[in-house]
Amino acid sequence: MAEDGSPATIETTTVHAEVLDDTDPTHLRRVAELRTTGVDVLDTLATQRASLRSLTPAPGELELTETPRWIHYPWRRTVVRLLGPLGFRRLRLDRNRNKITTAEQEQLSQLRIGIVGLSVGSAIAHAIALEGTAGSLRLADFDDLDLSNLNRLSATILDLGVNKAVLAQRRIAEIDPYLRVEAWTCGVDEHTIDAFLDGLDLVIEECDSFDVKVLIRDRARRRGIAVVMETSDRGLIDVERYDLDPDRPLFHGLLGDIDSASVAGLSVREKIPFGLRILEGSALSSRMAASVLDVGTALSTWPQLGGDVLLGGASVAAAVRRFGLGEPLPSGRVRIDIGDHLDQLREPHLPRDSTSSAADHTVRTDALDVRSLYDTCTDTDAVAFAATRAPSGGNAQPWIIDVDTTRLTLRIDETRSSTVDIEHRGSLVALGAALHNARIAAAHRNILGATEVSFDGTARIAFATGTDPQLAAQLPGMLNRGTHRGAPETDPASTNLADLTDLAAGLSTETHRIHLIEDRDTIDRLAETISATDRIRFLTDRLHREMIAELRWPDSNDLDTGIEVTSLGTPAAELVVLELLRRPDVMTHLNHWNTGQVLRSETTSRLTASNAIAVVTQTGTSAGDYIRGGALAEEFWIHTQSLGYSVHPMTPLPLYATAEHQLRHLSTDRIDELTTLWNELKTLTDTTDNNPATLILRIFRTTTPAPTSRRRLPHHH
């Protein structure tokens, strides 16, 4: 019975797609019977299974071993063999990922949605079914397909005279026979509305009748059911969240305090002003507004275009996703007006920091004549200049260099630190490299006096008559030293590393050692570990922002610091990927999905193809220990490059952590993974918390020179 006591007449379809199970003898007899009637049989099960097995990640055992089904479509006189519901859904919806994740797809499959009006509503139902964003659909329309509907409704002339709800139901069954779809061929009225709304989470209203529009909202409000409407003119999306605000007025209050009782008995003419208020006449397109005035004289009804209806289907499908996932979808209206957007067509703007602009520039290997600049310096300035040529993480140059006639002083610039620079240890290593360079220049200019490294991490060189031939001989190599981030060009196993082994042994001291890793298995494991820490750096918002901030494009205003993108060793054609890697919102999604393994690929490939990995280690963790370790690393780098090798320093995320609590400073969300990687790194590099790594260097052969990076000028007094 309906609410007013009158009998409710509900008409639904009785001709559905039959789903027949291979393991049910009764169903198998039905399939055999159908074959005798001359139905067409379509069996591509082998191909479907092959496609299912090829998916990444691999399907589970239940999906792979599930019993297939036969689907009988009586209106097509066809029987189709398909994967069972689990495998079918996994394969059919696989290309949704990760616009819709697997977990989100499962959440959306619980939605129960009703659609009233299957002209515009047909496109909406189709879009929802395509995306698999509902577990059941209830479709209501009393009208049959007319030839005049074929300008906007996806059907064919073979469907003329078929009820519109039935047409939508059939179309969906041919997309997903496992999706529950009810077709209410009686439409919706005062007697059937309550039964229609029973169990629904959301109702989409696309009917022509003003009375029914009011009725649906009135009863949906009583039940706390949200209502969405799309009007194809200028792409109007209308959302009324009665589930969140059951006291809100119908139609956002545009019609005042109205309900279904207050509009009962109004004439068609009396309803026209209400319709115009709902449509907001001032916001109609000019063609639609003019057409409304012609309805009944020059036009039989208001116009609708197929493209606009299809857009409406996509728009409402997007709203359904938000609703089902609990994402922001407030009550209100918005217009998705394609015409307005087409009026805004413009030539694309190429930002100065785009990868396209970077691709137009080649790697600059001789833009700076470092030796000529050095030769033009006074003796004290030459020492300061040499200090600036030291390497540092992200080319941050985290030092303050003061020079006068008596000495050069180096100290940490804490403003140039980063999260990875735990307790400024990376900065101290860079300071040590700068100190070594300065001593080389002082020896070359014959002004090398006493060197002092203070407990607080300050380093000084006094200027006095003096030299060191071994230091002075390193000048050409020091000025030519550079970071090469490119890929190796030779087989890593084909190079004899005896010269490198001798160098590492000769430079090692009792407190600071150079450990050369040549074993291919160890290098491969290091590549896996270090690349995994790189992935965490990408996926952790603060670390990602700091990393991207280090990059410099050719037209940047600050090329004296940071890393020029043209020096990354990435082929110009692949630089476009940087446009994705630099976006925090992209990394946020990958982090949420726990994916993004591709973020490891470049580090992995570069490390595994290297000839050797050098690990500079130290005894102790004082500031002086890191400074002296940095000086040793720089000396080794200079000599290694002079032997014809290329060098690329690697900074695994936990490199400068010497206690587990310091890892939380890096990434609280991935602390367990990071702790595991930290322990693996220490094992592979033979380091401990008291004998940590100073620096890790990737060493390889290539015929291309390292690009020359720019530097800030030192301070003078």
Which role does the model predict for each range below?
Residues D308, P328-H717:
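Acidic, surface-exposed loops and disordered segments
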Residues L145-S148, D233-E240, Y656-A657:
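Short gly/pro/ser/thr-enriched loop/turn and capping motifs at secondary-structure boundaries
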